[in-house]
UniProtKB/Swiss-Prot annotation:
Domain Velvet: 27-230
Extent of motif Nuclear localization signal: 41-46
Phosphotyrosine sites (modified residues): 254
PANTHER family xrefs: DEVELOPMENTAL AND SECONDARY METABOLISM REGULATOR VEA, SPORE DEVELOPMENT REGULATOR VOSA
Biased composition (Pro residues): 1-11, 318-339, 347-361
Bias type Polar residues, positions: 452-493
Domain notes: The C-terminal PEST domain is a region rich in proline, glutamic acid, serine and threonine residues that is required for the light-dependent regulation of development and secondary metabolism.
Record's keyword annotation contains RNA-binding: no
Entry annotated with the keyword Transcription regulation: yes
Main subcellular location of this protein, as a coarse class: nucleus
Region (PEST): 459-498
Annotated region described as Disordered, given as residue ranges: 1-24, 39-63, 236-295, 307-367, 384-573
Protein name in UniProt: Developmental and secondary metabolism regulator veA
Length: 573
């Protein structure tokens, strides 16, 4: 039978360790010593109910109890031998839960409630070398159902294997009879009890959280024992949120949602935080571009045009003189084949209008309608600042321009035009009104004024519109071909020749326009069939020259796709 050991020591600090001694049949003294190396500190209540048995909330940290066994002479306790590893017996430790303060039992309190302690309350001994060479009892799965303040009470039980290790004065165990079934004759003897420090069981809302695993738990786990290890702090801060290390994101989100009057005096920096309006009229950009083109009166002073304006290409070798302003003290640098300034300003016959000089700060323009031909740039002369006068156009704008195929903004649209005597008559020939017939673009009186205007198109403004000269009949065509022009220099385009097309000398394959007629060419960038500007450095002769050349033996020769050369009379359209 199990014998009762000495009563447990009083509670307090001395309750963390306890020891007891007994005398064996051989007259030896054996001492048992229990020491709680790791005390429980906190736990979360796992609650009551049908699922409470699966809700494991172990006590943190897990309790660890150390067992040491010593053997000595009954009359001399100074010479003790540690026999923990060589003692032949079985030990286990049983844990019970007790309240911190004992509750007096009433007369009518006969029925105890449901058990508060859950989990595995029994632990076997594990012989380890660290932290000390001893036996250890580990309780990694102890849970408490209700919140409160409790203590653990650990009871040590021993199962003796050798009869000589039995306690002195007890009856010897009967020897088992072979081949006869009988009840087991082994007994468990209670040795001693040790009580832990009080710990608190919290509810789910008040639980502060779990801490990292202690060095003792890590050391025991490294030796193969079942202990749950946590490498980070799992603390829950639900109570007073006073520090900024764990709710920084919440405060930052609150600051971003604050109204503008709490932010600061800088209204431009906090503008994106204001609520947006659903009205389209209130979302207009104050610095956006105007929806209409301002007139010349709104702009006032002339402004230089910062970008290049694409214009229709003209024959590369031919160029026309541009009259220089009268206040210029010296000659102006002009392209090749330019006559002297005196001849440029000489009066011309009434049928030949003068070209207006370019305005101030006119940049060079580059043609974008070359269609594969070499693009040319003509530098504009730098003129001095001259007082200018505003000229109001007298006729509506005609979109069917005989010079350019796409209307582009020029500098003169933002500047007042310069008051030169021949500027109004030049633009009248350049832009016919809507009431004029379409065949007026190829009349002979306009040929001499159109050719210089094509070359000077990239240097002169195009917003001044005046009246057109009178239209001459077709019967006067032969007489007008021999009229001289004093304001136009010699140009390859003005020399008579038997060819229908005027082309530059190129050592490459002929283009599409060289083999096909005027109406067969593709139209790009707003080009019109009645336009007289042709890409690729080619310009078609007027209709009166074609009619005169048709009487001759001129034929058009072209190469077919199979490589055979074919010639036929030129087709007039």
């Amino acid at each position: 039978m199990a014998t009762l050991a000495a009563p447990p020591p009083p509670l307090g600090e001395s309750g963390n360790s306890n020891s007891v001694s007994r005398i064996t049949r051989e007259g030896k003294k054996i001492t048992y010593k229990l020491n709680i190396m790791q005390q429980p500190k906190r736990a979360r209540a796992c609650g009551q109910g049908s699922k409470s048995h699966t809700d494991r909330r172990p006590v943190d940290p897990p309790p660890v109890i150390e067992l040491n066994i010593f053997e000595s002479d009954p009359h001399d306790d100074s010479n003790k031998t540690d026999i923990t590893f060589v003692y032949n017996a079985n030990f286990f430790l049983f844990a019970t839960l007790e309240p911190e303060r004992p509750i007096a039992t009433g007369k009518l309190m006969t029925n105890q409630g449901s058990p508060v302690l859950t989990g595995v309350p029994v632990a076997g001994v594990a012989y380890l070398d660290k932290p000390n060479r001893a036996g250890y009892f580990i309780f990694p799965d102890l849970s408490v159902r209700n919140e409160g303040s409790y203590r653990f009470s650990f009871h040590l039980f021993e199962q003796i294997k050798d009869p000589k290790d039995a306690t002195e004065g007890t009856q010897p165990m009967p020897s088992p009879v072979p081949g006869k079934l009988s009840s087991p004759q082994e007994f468990l003897e209670f040795r001693l009890e040790v009580i832990s420090n009080p710990f608190i069981v919290y509810s789910a809302k008040k639980f502060p959280g779990l801490t990292t695993s202690t060095p003792i738990s890590r050391m025991i786990a490294e030796q193969g024992c079942r202990v749950r290890i946590r490498r980070d702090v799992r603390m829950r801060r639900r109570g007073d949120k006073r520090t900024e290390d764990y709710d920084y994101d919440n405060e930052r989100g609150y600051n971003n949602r604050r109204p503008d009057q709490y932010a600061g005096s800088d209204a431009y920096a906090n503008a994106p935080e204001r609520p947006r309006s659903t009205s389209i009229s209130t979302n207009m950009d104050p610095y956006s571009y105007p929806s209409r083109r301002p007139s010349a009166v709104e702009y006032g002073q002339p402004i230089a045009q910062p970008y290049q304006r694409p214009m229709a290409s003209t024959p590369a070798p031919s160029s026309t003189p541009i009259p220089a302003p009268i206040p210029m003290p010296g000659p102006v640098a002009l392209p090749p084949s330019t006559p002297s300034p005196a001849s440029a300003h000489a009066p011309a016959p009434p049928s030949v209008p003068l070209a207006a000089p370019p305005p101030l700060h006119t940049p060079s323009y580059q043609s974008h309608l070359s269609f594969g031909a070499t693009q040319t740039q003509y530098p504009a002369p730098q003129l001095s600042h001259i007082p200018q006068q505003t000229t109001t156009p007298t006729h509506p704008y005609s979109p069917r321009s005989s010079i350019s195929h796409s209307r582009n903004q020029s500098i003169s649209e933002y500047e007042p035009s310069m008051g030169y005597p021949g500027s109004q008559t030049r633009l009248s020939a350049e832009r016919p009104s809507y009431g004029q017939p379409s065949q007026t673009t190829s009349l002979p009186p306009l040929r001499h004024s159109l050719e210089p205007s094509v070359n000077s198109r990239s240097k002169t403004p195009s917003n001044m519109i005046t009246s057109l000269p009178p239209i001459q009949s077709l019967s006067e065509l032969p007489s007008t071909t021999s009229q001289p022009s004093s304001a136009i220099g010699s140009s390859p385009a003005n020399e008579p020749g038997p060819r229908l097309w005027e082309t530059n000398s190129m050592l490459s394959k002929r283009t599409y326009e060289e083999s096909f007629g005027h109406d067969d060419r593709p139209l790009y960038n707003g080009m019109r069939p009645d336009s007289e500007s042709y890409p690729g450095g080619m310009q078609r002769r007027p209709s009166y020259e074609r009619s005169s050349l048709l009487d001759g033996p001129d034929q058009m020769a072209y190469k077919r796709a199979n490589g055979r050369m074919v010639s036929k009379p030129a087709t007039m359209r």
